[in-house]
């Protein structure tokens, strides 16, 4: 019994040494299932399993490190095309905007503004400026072929008055925007009509600059959110390694105590 279990263990060790960690795990698991009474082989298998899991996590980390470097390279290549708005005193996380869409350049204009924070969370703001309120809480974007996308009612909207001008703003997060951001990105080279959805009808056309801003910020958001996802996976892999090391220490202490 032990002999057959040890043969399996040898196959597992060989797989481990050539870096085939899935095969090694599967061989160790089979010892437990096929030879439950081969205690020595099972014990050796458990010890090997900890080594296998450590190496597997290290391999994952190496892959994640190179993926993070690649994404960082993509980010560095385009970050200077954007303006980072961040008040160091009040904000831990700043927002990237397309230079053409800063507040100073767009006074008294009704348009869709796009931004992404440093953690990759993108949002769109529909801004309305006019002589009278329309009380809008959503927008619909329409392509020349009649296809369209429409936001749900914004959960974050407000209205104000400045020197007799009515200003309304409504925010929509990517993923809760009725795919309006994705639709604009897809149709960035086409003429897009914007219909503000409120008590009164209001329509405008997206300028080519606004369409390009949407696409550029969308691309940046994909890169930044991918970087955040990689960081999260790196943390998970490091935690797993920490957990395995603690398990190894415990086993070593138990063996000393047994002696």
What do the PLM-derived regions correspond to, one by one?
Residues 48-79, 87-90:
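Alpha-helical linker/edge segments of TPR/alpha-solenoid repeat scaffolds
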Residues 25-57:
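Short, charge-rich amphipathic alpha-helical segments embedded
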Residues 146-174:
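Extended, solvent-exposed segments with strong compositional bias
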Residues 106-134:
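Contiguous beta-strand segments within globular domains
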Residues 2-8:
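Generic helix N-cap/helix-start motif at coil->alpha-helix transitions
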Residues 9-17:
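Hydrophobic/aromatic side-chain positions at a characteristic register within alpha-helices
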Residues 164-171, 189-259:
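Internal interaction segment
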